[in-house]
Amino acid sequence: QRVGKCIGILAQKTGIYGMIGGQTVDVELTDKLIPKDKLDFIYRLKTGALLEAAMVIGAVMAGASDEECETVERMAAAIGLAFQIQDDILDVTSSQEVLGKPVLSDEKNNKTTYVSLEGIEKAKRDVEKLSETAVDILYSLPGSNDFLEDLIKVLVSREK
């Protein structure tokens, strides 16, 4: 029964209501100024859905209740958005040597990002707030969560 539920989660999070849908909207809106709410939508579907799938499937397989799975999903959404905003920041503040991929690619491709909408400092504050939200949500779950807290902090404060 758990495996079937996990397959459903994976199908939903990777399909048109998840990563594929987010990528489609992202491509369709290239070269257009995207308002923040639409950018949030794209990021939540692309990066957020990927993390939600991984984390919720893990919770299901560990025997979490439906309520706990919903909590994990909210936490993963916050982590995913923070991760993507950090990616936007690194695209303009890092180097190709550090990142291992070309920098300023969003600007070259005329893509709207948190940095282009809000500036680097506000984007950094958004990352911090979202990671704090994720950690707060984490500690509403049962069990020892120190490792997961450290993992969240590493994911959203990474330099590559």
Please give the residue ranges for each predicted region.
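All-alpha prenyltransferase/terpene-synthase fold signal
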Residues: 1-160
